[in-house]
């Protein structure tokens, strides 16, 4: 083989039984499963009996109100909000874990406040935000009073007067919008003192030893890895700090972007120190994080939004991927098929997660993966700000806007942030559609593996066997899918309410999601530290990667919006009405 295999995302090789304990993909699965099992033991083993009692009480109120009125009343929403306050991660154990995994916090002008915030500084922040909170609270209280009057008028008419019902719904909707703003302002007056200067070194040691287990079995030099991991972790912490700076956060330049930027600055100026290089295990970190992501893809949530969401995510996405790849090959004449495929998958499916899976399936070069992820991060930062602003300016319905953003913005976190800017319904629809789209990570990886074996690297006159496809298929995707299936079963058995409390607000947000965030940050840091500008330069010849991304994303925007409108407002308006 002419190419240097160390420059490929996943090396060629035949499958053996020993792969289960000597290969990176399997270790990503085992480590991911260890975290998820630990999460289940910590949060699911002994649920508080108060949860079930409070859920039953809230559901009784909601059922009674749903029968009493043809719309969601104030009492209905109050009960719904009471359920939303129940979180397994609010237990003593959950709070301890959260404190240990805490990343650097937000800051404006003093970066040290990202690590240590004194009681006096916390009180100063609270005092500065108090006036805005009080104004938001007064507005919310006034909106609630107006909604009470409107609902009382509708109730007095026996909820038989359509005009009064509509007026009540309108006032309640205004109250909900003002309440959301008040809650956002309230967070800023509840700032607490913290000090993570001691927990961060401990977290570094624990994470280093955690990944070192796999490194030992894979035949790497563990002491050298651990020494190098210190350097990677320190850069990752700086990236976390920069990503939480208020201005950077506002403009969407998050942790991932800073991890790559800082890493590349080091690599292309003073050079990445040799002692750090053994810890630049990009795929190892990100694949472990992707296994954890699988647990967040729950089938009951997919079913909840119905066929419209599935059409937006599962019909549009493969069309855009295939058309973009063909456009790159036939029109742009992209010299690298692997770069073309990775960019197409990155842009059409779900950003970096799809990029790493696709790069593994088609044996893309690491520089091609870096370039693709870089494009994704830049456009994600732009779209998460521009799209919600545009949607608001043209008066697009929240559900349509949420579906549009969920199907087009690459990163899951950016989708949630953009959806929250529009409102509760937009956030729910956007996040759910992105989650449905995440399921395609495994499907796309398998499809690309088959296509590359059968069409791109095939030998004339020789048929492709399943063994060859299996050898190429990125095995960590099996961990992603297994985690999704297991947690979907657990979630379904608990019921939607208890699943939200114990799984989503327990195992996931209390343990696996924070760790996934750290693992992704480590991976992006390693990408930056391993990237040489000179090696990337020739890929930008003629600007073809940028043109491919812009054209593909433009097609994605048009097709997703069209499909969302047809599915949510023409074919299935009754489902839209229930959201």
Swiss-Prot record:
A GO CC term assigned to this protein in UniProt: plasma membrane
Domain of life: Bacteria
Membrane-protein topology: Multi-pass membrane protein
Localization (cell): Cell membrane
InterPro entries: UPF0324_pro
Keyword Cell membrane listed: yes
One Pfam family here: Cons_hypoth698
Transmembrane segments: 26-45, 193-215, 225-243, 250-272, 305-327, 369-391, 430-452, 473-495, 515-533, 546-568
Keyword set, alphabetical order: Cell membrane, Membrane, Transmembrane, Transmembrane helix
Signal peptide coordinates: none
Protein family according to the UniProt entry: Belongs to the UPF0324 family.
Protein known as: UPF0324 membrane protein DVU_0943
Organism expressing this protein natively: Nitratidesulfovibrio vulgaris (strain ATCC 29579 / DSM 644 / CCUG 34227 / NCIMB 8303 / VKM B-1760 / Hildenborough)
């Amino acid at each position: 083989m002419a190419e240097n295999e160390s420059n490929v995302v996943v090396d060629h090789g035949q499958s053996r039984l020993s792969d289960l304990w000597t290969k990176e993909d399997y270790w990503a699965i085992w480590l991911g499963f260890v975290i998820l099992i630990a999460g289940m033991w910590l949060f699911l083993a002994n649920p508080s009996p108060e949860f079930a009692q409070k859920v039953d009480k809230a559901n009784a109120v909601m059922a009674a109100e749903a029968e009493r009125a043809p719309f969601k009343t104030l009492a209905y929403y109050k009960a719904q909000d009471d359920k939303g306050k129940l979180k397994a991660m609010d237990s003593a154990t959950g709070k301890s874990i959260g404190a240990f995994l805490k990343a650097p916090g937000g800051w404006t002008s003093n970066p040290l406040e990202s690590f240590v915030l004194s009681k006096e500084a916390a009180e100063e922040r609270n005092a500065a935000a108090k006036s805005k909170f009080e104004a938001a609270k007064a507005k919310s209280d006034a909106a609630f009073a107006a909604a009470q009057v409107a609902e009382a008028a509708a109730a007095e008419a026996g909820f038989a007067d359509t005009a009064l019902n509509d007026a009540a719904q309108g006032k309640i909707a205004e109250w909900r919008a003002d309440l959301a703003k008040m809650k956002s302002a309230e967070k800023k007056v509840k700032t607490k003192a913290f000090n993570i200067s001691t927990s961060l070194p401990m977290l570094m040691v624990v994470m280093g030893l955690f990944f070192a287990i796999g490194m030992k079995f894979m035949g790497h030099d563990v002491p050298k890895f651990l020494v190098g991991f210190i350097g990677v972790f320190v850069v990752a912490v700086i990236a976390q700090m920069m990503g939480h700076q208020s201005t950077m956060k506002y403009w969407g330049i998050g942790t991932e972007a800073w991890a790559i930027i800082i890493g590349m600055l080091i690599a292309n100026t003073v050079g990445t120190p040799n002692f750090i290089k053994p810890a630049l295990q990009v795929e190892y970190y990100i694949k472990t994080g992707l296994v954890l992501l699988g647990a967040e893809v729950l089938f009951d949530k997919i079913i909840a939004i119905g066929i419209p969401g599935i059409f937006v995510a599962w019909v549009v996405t493969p069309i855009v991927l295939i058309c973009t790849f063909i456009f790159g090959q036939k029109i742009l004449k992209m010299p690298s098929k692997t770069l073309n495929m990775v960019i197409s998958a990155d842009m059409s499916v779900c950003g970096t997660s799809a990029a790493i899976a696709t790069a593994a399936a088609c044996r893309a070069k690491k520089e091609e993966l870096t370039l693709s992820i870089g494009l994704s991060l830049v456009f994600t930062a732009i779209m998460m700000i521009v799209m919600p602003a545009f949607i608001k300016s043209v008066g697009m319905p929240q559900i349509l806007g949420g579906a549009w953003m969920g199907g087009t913005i690459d990163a899951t976190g950016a989708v949630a942030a953009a959806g929250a800017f529009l409102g509760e319904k937009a956030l729910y629809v956007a996040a759910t559609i992105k989650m449905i789209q995440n399921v395609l990570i495994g499907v796309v990886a398998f499809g690309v593996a088959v296509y590359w074996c059968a069409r791109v690297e095939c030998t004339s006159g020789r048929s492709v066997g399943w063994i060859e496809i299996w050898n190429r298929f990125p095995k960590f995707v099996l961990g992603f899918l297994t985690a999704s299936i297991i947690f979907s079963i657990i979630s379904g058995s608990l019921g939607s309410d208890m699943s939200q409390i114990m799984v989503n607000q327990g195992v996931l947000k209390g343990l696996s999601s924070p760790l996934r965030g750290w693992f992704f940050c480590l991976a992006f840091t390693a990408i930056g530290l391993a990237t040489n500008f000179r090696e990337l330069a020739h890929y930008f010849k003629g600007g073809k990667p940028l043109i491919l991304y812009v054209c593909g994303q433009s097609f994605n925007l048009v097709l997703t919006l069209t499909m969302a409108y047809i599915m949510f407002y023409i074919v299935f308006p009754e489902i839209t009405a229930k959201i």
